Regions:
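Active-site donor-binding loop signature of nucleotide-sugar glycosyltransferases
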Residues: 15, 39, 121, 131, ...
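CN hydrolase (nitrilase-like) catalytic-core segments centered on the catalytic cysteine
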Residues: 53-136
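Hydrophobic residues at beta-strand termini and immediately following loops
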Residues: 13, 37, 100, 129, ...
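Short beta-strand scaffold segments in enzyme catalytic cores
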Residues: 1-3, 35-36, 116-118, 136-139
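Short, surface-exposed linear segments at secondary-structure transitions and domain or protein termini
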Residues: 20-25, 135-138, 143-147
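Active-site catalytic loop in hydrolytic enzyme cores
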Residues: 1-63, 72, 77-84, 150-155, ...
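Short, basic/aromatic-enriched C-terminal tail that caps enzymatic domains
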Residues: 138, 146-169
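RNA-binding accessory domains that recognize and position tRNA/RNA substrates
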Residues: 38-40, 91, 169
Length: 169
């Protein structure tokens, strides 16, 4: 995934969790870094598709990020899971979450319905693109509202301490 700024800065994230059912493990090497991008006062974490199924990888330790962005090829048969997990990531991480999914049919005849959305840290749906349509979803994300909510509901202070050990280490 890439994050490009109007100022010409470029950031990238290599997908950590390769989708073995799609043979990604045979063709790609999993990423091992989880860079948090600072942009205009926001801390942003980029993740890709199947990473969504692994909540520990996206765990917002000490509120290190404010916005979690997933880009995906999430197919129609598992679309309900996409919706549930995106909302769960917003709630458990007390973070805004943006999920960007494709539409159409790929070369393997797998259909995609879209379902691009933006969730608030309280799990409220702020914006969405209609299924099977190209489009843009816009919402106003307020960093002061996020910080105030984190102060009033500091669940992150009670989270379990852990460290991630990658399988290839």
């Amino acid at each position: 995934a890439f994050f490009l700024t109007p100022e010409g800065e470029a950031y990238y994230y290599d997908k950590r969790h390769l989708f073995r059912m799609g043979q990604e493990t045979e063709h790609f090497t999993a990423g091992s870094q989880r860079p948090v991008i600072s942009y205009r006062g926001w801390n942003i974490l980029l993740l890709v598709c199947y990473d969504l199924r692994f909540p520990v990888w996206s765990r917002n330790v000490n509120n290190e990020y404010d916005l979690l962005i997933y880009v995906a090829n999430w197919p129609v048969p598992r679309r309900r899971v996409w919706d549930i997990l995106l909302q769960a990531r917003a709630l458990e991480n007390i973070s805004y979450v943006c999920g960007v999914n494709r539409i159409g049919t790929d070369g393997n005849q797998i259909p995609y319905s879209g379902g691009s959305v933006i969730y608030s840290p309280k799990g409220d749906l702020l914006a969405s693109v209609p299924d099977y349509e190209e489009g843009t979803a816009t919402a106003t994300l307020d960093l002061s509202v996020l910080r105030e909510f984190r102060q009033k509901f500091p669940a992150w202070k009670d989270a379990d301490a852990f460290s991630i050990r990658l399988w290839n280490e």
